[in-house]
Amino acid sequence: SFPTRRSSDLTPYFKFRQALGTAEEEIYQMFKKELTEGISGSGIKPGVIKLASSKGEITEYEKMFFRAGARVQQETGAVILTHTQEGTMGPEQVRLLIEHGADPGKIIIGHMCGNTDPEYHKQVLDQGVRIGMDRFGIQGMVGAPFDQERVQTLLALLNDGYEDQILLAHDTVNIWLGRPPVMPEQAAKIMENWQPGHIFTNILPQL
């Protein structure tokens, strides 16, 4: 499986700035400048603010980004899209963002299909945000359940009326930086549906 990156593994720039006490303000300024002016002088502006937390915790390092993201969202109206590691910390992400002023109607908690408990999903959805069931096709790797388990979870949520708060996707990689990975034959077979047509061909007919 792919390794899990933790905040302790990250490049030292913001870790150093965190020690100086200036990191959160710099993160805020970076987010705002990229959203309003573009990335690195390119003029290309992001469509979302992406935030991420670790498996089973939101570290103090990660919380800086969540607070800065919530602050920038209030000023720009940008959508916040998060990464959850194996579907953990979804409710905690939402509470942290809302506590710092983020609009729940513009929050998407991503990779929630890493968790197959409908009641857990409802803890997130009932706070007024949307969730991404967005890793269809990724199975047996990075802690991912099998698609059939995801479908059963999705059906339970649809039956309970949450259809307007759920987004479906594949989390596919369209352009690899460097060489694309070569998977062992068994893994390649399990992952054969990790491609953009999978939802339309195989998932939607089950709903």
Predicted feature locations:
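Acidic (Asp/Glu)-rich catalytic clusters
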Residues: 1, 34-44, 71-74, 98-101, ...
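Glycine-rich anion/phosphate-binding loops
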Residues: 1, 20-33
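Short, small-residue-biased leader/transition segments that mark boundaries at the very start
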Residues: 2-7
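Active-site-proximal loop/turn and secondary-structure-junction residues that shape catalytic pockets
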Residues: 9-11, 53-55, 86-88, 113-116, ...
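Short acidic/histidine-rich active-site segments
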Residues: 80, 133-135, 163-185
